[in-house]
């Protein structure tokens, strides 16, 4: 008699013999393991046959299968516990599935149900994070959520995702994961390994507390933040916890509940690269963390970390090694400014050349200031995502300043000094202008909630909390006042120009020229307001009196609130020269090759 399973061949014995008739060594065709089969006749003399499977040397506990006659479906499975084959436990089963379960093997003759990954169509390994998926998509989704990675699509955000092309566009792959039902909160709630204790930067919070903001997908109203703290919260040394999770209500949410930010394809093409430098700094920070923790070997082939780091160093090298040919034009040459008035030197005193702008200081291209947020947006945002959004705003502001012909004419050294002196004011104006896009009120509410809990647990000093809370209050007041005045794009552009060309910062050279540009910006703002809002006599005065409030906000606190979670101990001042030296083509080149 031959067993129906192809894995083990069992040979029967003559039923007239009551003692073991045959001992045969067979090999499991799948595992290659050798098994000993002893064939015997049941002591009662019935036709039942007993097949004893033990190790080849006859030692150790074996499995005994007592097979009934072909007319019966009953089967007995006996586990022996001694050398004399006295059964230690007998379990009677009547269905093949139970036999398979007890034997620890599957019936290969029974057709197996094969499930396929709903994302890429590969063979699924089970249900992961709420959707049937393969190990590849499971790992990709987990890494994307755990590391809060942001991707961009080189096409129109509708790339084909299948088994063979799933690695070509990570943006569309993550988008499809969300569309097919994978839940980010399922990844966040997973238990972290106990033996992995990563050292955090000294100026970042070490707490494991999390902030959740409940969101009604059908309501555009700002949600109310609620605080959840882990039991083992550790000592906090900075303002924000890198593990803090924030759910930010976005004005545009698809009806099917998919949490994706609506993006303008043209804006993504022209401005999407502005987030590249944030990714560059993030890549360098991630590299440092990986090397410090010795976990570089854990990186998967699907991760783009290695290539991102390579591109990061290449980009920074290009910025540092910029040749003289890439420097701004000489003051003696007229700058052809498609984005503003022409620049001409009207005095050739080598010590203090005077530059005159023919035409407007700013053009319509400088009025456009559209921030593209990282997408897709995770349902629970953490500090890294907030810092990534803030860094895009900072880079957009610097890109805007660099495009002004009058700014270019001042030279690279003066450009760096000006931006270092006023980046906090430019950034704050950008926050006010993009407050709705960034859901700034919700972000600030979550931060306040987090800080309130920190002071209750004595993680931050009272004086430090007071400084930060005052800073947040000033920031919120400024943004609210600008929203109340309903400042338009032209007015924001001229206010930024007035702030940019401020001659009263310590250490500036050529202050007379800078002051001349500031006066021109003020005059053009006055002309615009009088022409556009002729009925509002005091509008210009109400706008200008808001500028002193910008000087009251600490750049150090702004840096720690919005950037420390991304760049660690790297200061904004040290990054500014690299940003100003980099060309727009380099930004776009980074984005074009960002997706693997």
Swiss-Prot record:
<comment type="subunit">
    <text>Homodimer; can bind DNA as homodimer. Heterodimer; binds DNA as a heterodimer with NR2C1 required for chromatin remodeling and for binding to promoter regions such as globin DR1 repeats. Interacts with NR2C2AP; the interaction represses selective NR2C2-mediated transcriptional activity. Interacts with PCAF; the interaction preferentially occurs on the non-phosphorylated form and induces NR2C2-mediated transactivation activity and does not require the ligand-binding domain. Interacts (MAPK-mediated phosphorylated form) with NRIP1; the interaction promotes repression of NR2C2-mediated activity.</text>
</comment>
<dbReference type="GO" id="GO:0043565">
    <property type="term" value="F:sequence-specific DNA binding"/>
</dbReference>
<dbReference type="GO" id="GO:0003700">
    <property type="term" value="F:DNA-binding transcription factor activity"/>
</dbReference>
<keyword id="KW-0805">Transcription regulation</keyword>
<dbReference type="InterPro" id="IPR000536">
    <property type="entry name" value="Nucl_hrmn_rcpt_lig-bd"/>
</dbReference>
<dbReference type="GO" id="GO:0007283">
    <property type="term" value="P:spermatogenesis"/>
</dbReference>
<feature type="modified residue" description="Phosphoserine; by MAPK">
    <location>
        <position position="19"/>
    </location>
</feature>
<dbReference type="GO" id="GO:0045944">
    <property type="term" value="P:positive regulation of transcription by RNA polymerase II"/>
</dbReference>
<feature type="modified residue" description="Phosphoserine">
    <location>
        <position position="46"/>
    </location>
</feature>
<feature type="modified residue" description="Phosphoserine">
    <location>
        <position position="219"/>
    </location>
</feature>
<dbReference type="GO" id="GO:0001228">
    <property type="term" value="F:DNA-binding transcription activator activity, RNA polymerase II-specific"/>
</dbReference>
<dbReference type="GO" id="GO:1990837">
    <property type="term" value="F:sequence-specific double-stranded DNA binding"/>
</dbReference>
<dbReference type="GO" id="GO:0045663">
    <property type="term" value="P:positive regulation of myoblast differentiation"/>
</dbReference>
<keyword id="KW-0597">Phosphoprotein</keyword>
<dbReference type="InterPro" id="IPR048246">
    <property type="entry name" value="NR2C1/2-like_LBD"/>
</dbReference>
<keyword id="KW-0675">Receptor</keyword>
<feature type="DNA-binding region" description="Nuclear receptor">
    <location>
        <begin position="114"/>
        <end position="189"/>
    </location>
</feature>
<keyword id="KW-0539">Nucleus</keyword>
<dbReference type="Pfam" id="PF00104">
    <property type="entry name" value="Hormone_recep"/>
</dbReference>
<keyword id="KW-0744">Spermatogenesis</keyword>
<dbReference type="GO" id="GO:0005634">
    <property type="term" value="C:nucleus"/>
</dbReference>
<dbReference type="GO" id="GO:0030154">
    <property type="term" value="P:cell differentiation"/>
</dbReference>
<feature type="zinc finger region" description="NR C4-type">
    <location>
        <begin position="117"/>
        <end position="137"/>
    </location>
</feature>
<comment type="function">
    <text>Orphan nuclear receptor that can act as a repressor or activator of transcription. An important repressor of nuclear receptor signaling pathways such as retinoic acid receptor, retinoid X, vitamin D3 receptor, thyroid hormone receptor and estrogen receptor pathways. May regulate gene expression during the late phase of spermatogenesis. Activates transcriptional activity of LHCG and is antagonist of PPARA-mediated transactivation.</text>
</comment>
<dbReference type="GO" id="GO:0000122">
    <property type="term" value="P:negative regulation of transcription by RNA polymerase II"/>
</dbReference>
<dbReference type="GO" id="GO:0008270">
    <property type="term" value="F:zinc ion binding"/>
</dbReference>
<dbReference type="GO" id="GO:0031663">
    <property type="term" value="P:lipopolysaccharide-mediated signaling pathway"/>
</dbReference>
<dbReference type="InterPro" id="IPR050274">
    <property type="entry name" value="Nuclear_hormone_rcpt_NR2"/>
</dbReference>
<dbReference type="InterPro" id="IPR001723">
    <property type="entry name" value="Nuclear_hrmn_rcpt"/>
</dbReference>
<keyword id="KW-0678">Repressor</keyword>
<protein>
    <recommendedName>
        <fullName>Nuclear receptor subfamily 2 group C member 2</fullName>
    </recommendedName>
</protein>
<dbReference type="GO" id="GO:0040019">
    <property type="term" value="P:positive regulation of embryonic development"/>
</dbReference>
<dbReference type="GO" id="GO:0048520">
    <property type="term" value="P:positive regulation of behavior"/>
</dbReference>
<feature type="modified residue" description="Phosphoserine">
    <location>
        <position position="98"/>
    </location>
</feature>
<dbReference type="GO" id="GO:0051321">
    <property type="term" value="P:meiotic cell cycle"/>
</dbReference>
<keyword id="KW-0862">Zinc</keyword>
<keyword id="KW-0238">DNA-binding</keyword>
<feature type="domain" description="NR LBD">
    <location>
        <begin position="341"/>
        <end position="583"/>
    </location>
</feature>
<keyword id="KW-1017">Isopeptide bond</keyword>
<dbReference type="GO" id="GO:0021549">
    <property type="term" value="P:cerebellum development"/>
</dbReference>
<dbReference type="GO" id="GO:0038066">
    <property type="term" value="P:p38MAPK cascade"/>
</dbReference>
<dbReference type="InterPro" id="IPR048245">
    <property type="entry name" value="NR2C1/2-like_DBD"/>
</dbReference>
């Amino acid at each position: 008699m031959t067993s129906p399973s192809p894995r083990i061949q069992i040979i029967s014995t003559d039923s007239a013999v009551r003692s073991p008739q045959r001992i045969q060594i067979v090999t499991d065709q799948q595992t290659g393991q050798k098994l000993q089969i002893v064939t015997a006749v049941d002591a009662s003399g019935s036709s039942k046959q007993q097949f004893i499977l033990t190790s080849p040397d006859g030692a150790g506990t074996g499995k005994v299968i007592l097979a009934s006659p072909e007319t019966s479906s009953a089967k007995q499975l006996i586990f022996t516990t001694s050398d004399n084959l006295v059964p230690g436990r007998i379990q009677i089963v009547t269905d093949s599935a139970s036999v398979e379960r007890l034997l620890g093997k599957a019936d290969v003759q029974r057709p197996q149900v094969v499930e396929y990954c709903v994302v890429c169509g590969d063979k699924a390994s089970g249900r992961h994070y709420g959707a049937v998926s393969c190990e590849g998509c499971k790992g990709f989704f987990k890494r994307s959520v755990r590391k809060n990675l942001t991707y961009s699509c080189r096409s129109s955000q509708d790339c084909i995702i299948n088994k063979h092309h799933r690695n070509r566009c990570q943006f569309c792959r993550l988008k499809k994961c969300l569309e097919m039902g994978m839940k980010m909160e399922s990844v966040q709630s997973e238990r972290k390994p106990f033996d992995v204790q990563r050292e955090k930067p000294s100026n970042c919070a070490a707490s494991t507390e999390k902030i959740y903001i409940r969101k009604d997908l059908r309501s555009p109203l700002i949600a109310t933040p609620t605080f959840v703290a882990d039991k083992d919260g550790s000592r906090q040394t900075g303002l924000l916890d890198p593990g803090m999770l924030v759910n930010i209500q976005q004005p545009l949410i698809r009806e099917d509940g998919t949490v994706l930010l609506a993006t303008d394809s043209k804006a993504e093409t022209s401005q999407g690269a502005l987030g590249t430098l944030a990714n560059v700094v993030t890549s360098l920070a991630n590299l440092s963390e990986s090397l410090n923790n010795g976990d570089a070997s854990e990186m998967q082939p699907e991760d783009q970390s290695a290539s991102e780091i390579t591109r990061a160093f290449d980009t920074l090298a290009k910025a540092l090694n910029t040749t003289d040919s890439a420097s701004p034009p000489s003051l003696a040459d007229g700058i052809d400014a498609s984005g503003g008035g022409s620049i001409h030197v009207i005095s050739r005193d080598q010590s203090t050349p005077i530059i005159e702008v023919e035409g407007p200081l700013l053009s319509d291209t400088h009025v456009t200031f559209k921030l593209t947020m990282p997408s897709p947006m995770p349902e629970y945002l953490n500090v890294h995502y907030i810092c990534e959004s803030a860094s895009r705003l900072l880079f957009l502001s610097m890109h805007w300043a660099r495009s002004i012909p009058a700014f270019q004419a001042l030279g690279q050294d003066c450009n760096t000094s000006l931006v270092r002196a006023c980046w906090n004011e430019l950034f704050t104006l950008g926050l006010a202008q993009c407050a709705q896009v960034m859901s700034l009120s919700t972000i600030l509410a979550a931060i306040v909630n987090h800080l309130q809990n920190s002071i209750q647990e004595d993680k931050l000093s009272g004086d430090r909390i007071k400084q930060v809370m005052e800073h947040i209050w000033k920031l919120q007041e400024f943004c609210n006042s600008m929203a109340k005045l309903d400042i338009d794009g032209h007015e924001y552009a001229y206010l930024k120009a007035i702030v940019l060309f401020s001659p009263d910062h310590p250490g500036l050279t050529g202050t007379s020229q800078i002051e001349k540009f500031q006066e021109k910006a003020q005059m053009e703002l006055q002309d615009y307001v009088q022409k556009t809002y002729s009925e509002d006599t005091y509008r210009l005065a109400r706008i200008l009196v808001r500028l002193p409030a910008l000087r009251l906000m600490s750049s150090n606190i702004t840096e720690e609130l919005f950037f420390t979670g991304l760049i660690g101990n790297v200061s904004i001042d040290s990054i500014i020269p690299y940003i100003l030296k980099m060309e727009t083509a380099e930004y776009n080149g980074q984005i074009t090759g960002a997706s693997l």
